[in-house]
Swiss-Prot record:
Disruption phenotype: Impairs expression of SAP2 and OPT1. Impairs virulence in Drosophila as a host model.
Coiled-coil ranges from the UniProt annotation: none
Membrane topology: Peripheral membrane protein
UniProt organism field: Candida albicans (strain SC5314 / ATCC MYA-2876)
Protein's cellular compartments: Cell membrane; Nucleus
Name of the protein described by the UniProt record: Transcriptional regulator STP3
Keywords: Cell membrane, DNA-binding, Membrane, Metal-binding, Nucleus, Repeat, Virulence, Zinc, Zinc-finger, Zymogen
Main location: membrane
Function: Transcription factor that activates genes required for degradation of extracellular protein and uptake of peptides such as the secreted aspartyl protease SAP2 or the oligopeptide transporter OPT1. Required for virulence. Synthesized as latent cytoplasmic precursor, which, upon a signal initiated by the plasma membrane SPS amino acid sensor system (including CSY1 and CSH3), becomes proteolytically activated and relocates to the nucleus, where it induces the expression of SPS-sensor-regulated genes.
Zinc finger (C2H2-type) stretch: 315-337
Amino acid sequence: MLILSIGLIHHTSNKSLYTISPNKGKRYEPFTTTSLGNFQFHVVRFLHRLIYGTQRYQELFPPIQKIKNINNVKQQRIFPVNCAADDLDLGFGESDQIELFNHPSKDTYGQFNLIQLIDIFDPPQVHAPSSADEFFKSNKGSEHIDIFDMITRQPPPFHQHQLNIETPYFEDFATPLVLPPHEVSSDDVESYFSGSVSTVSSIEPLDDEFVPPPQPPRTHTSRKRKHDSISPPASSDSSSSSSYVPQLIPSSSSSVTSNGDSPVSPTTKRKYTKKKQPVFSNVDEPIVITTTTKTNNIDVKKITTTKNGTVENRFDCPSCDASFKVKGYLTRHLKKHSTSKAFECPFFDNHGVHGSKCHPTGGFSRRDTFKVHLRALHFIYPAGVKASQRNSFNGRCAGCFQYFDNNSEWLENHIEAGKCTGTVQYKQNVSNLLLD
C-alpha cells in the first residue's frame, strides 16, 4: 500500500477524490489507494484548491469564450465615475465642446427659471428714500428693467460669434447701466451716491452686485491732436467751422514750438544730414627714394619716404624679409647670416663623434645669446629647478661632471678659461695623441 501526496492526482472514475474534506476543520486529508492507473495529474486544479480552497479554478485562468468584455466594464459600473466638469458651473450647448457660458437662447438653469426667485427678496425696502428713487420710477414706464435678466445675460459662445465680440467675457458685470442721457440730471446722480442705504433690507451687502449704480456723466476734454500752427481759427459760425479742412503748411524753420500733449507733425521733424568731410585736393603724395648703403661691408637697401613733411627710413635685410627703422638693428641682424661667428659652442659637433649637435650651426654672433645657450644646455641642475632659479642653484658641468656652486662660476672659471676636459677640442687633441 502506497501513501501519496494530497491533491496531485485524482481518480478518473465518476467519484473523484478531492483534497478538501467536507469538514472545514480538516483542510488537507491524505488518502490511500492501490490503483495508480486510474488517476491523472492536474497541477493547475491543485494549485487553485490549495491557494483559494475552492473548485472554481477557472476564475484565475478563464477561457477566452467566457470573457465578454476585456475592458472590464462590469467592474467600472459598480461605483459612480467622477468627472472634473461636475464641480464647475458650465453650460452645454449643441456643440461637442464645453461652453463657459449658457446658450443665449436658453433662459433656464438647471430646469428652473431664474425669474421665479424674485419672490425671495423685498424690492420696496432696498434703499433709503432719496431723489434717485424718482429717477427709477420715471423709467418704469419707458422700459421694463429685469434685474435677474441683467445678471444672467451672457455673451454667446466663442465658437458661434467669435468675430462679433466687442468686449471680453468677464466684463459683463463691470459694464455700467446705460440710460437715456436726457432723463438723468447731475443732482439725481449726486443724491444717489450720497444717499444712505437702509438697514432694513436683508440683501443690502449685495445691492451693488445685482444693481450697478448709474455712472456720473463724464466730461471728456478734447485732446489737441494737431499742432498749434495748423489748427483752424475759431469761428462762431457752425457751418463755417464744420466745412473747414485743415491743410498742412510747410515751414522753413527748423524749430517748432508745440504743446507737451500734441505730437509733432511729420512735416515739421528736423532732418539730420551727415556733414560731408572736406575734400582737400592739395594733399601731399608720399615721395619714395631708394638708395644703397653699406654696413659691415654689406650692401643694404635704404628706402626713404617723405609724406606731409615727415621723413621715414627703412633698411631691408638682403638675406631675408626683415626690415628695420634703425641701421644699427640691421647691423646686429646681419651677424645671424654671417658664416664666421664670433662665439662658438665648445660642445658642438656636427657629426656627433666627440660632442653633440646642440645648435643648428654652433656659432653665435652675440655674447649674451652664447651664454644663454651654455647655461641652458651644458650645465646640469638639480631636478625640479625652474629656468628663473638657475642662477641660484649649484650643479655640474655636462662635459666633465665637475661640481660648481652656480653656473656663473662654472662659465667664467671653467669654460672661458679652457679648463674643461669634456669639450670637443680637448677630445680631438687626446685622440690625435693616441693615434700618433
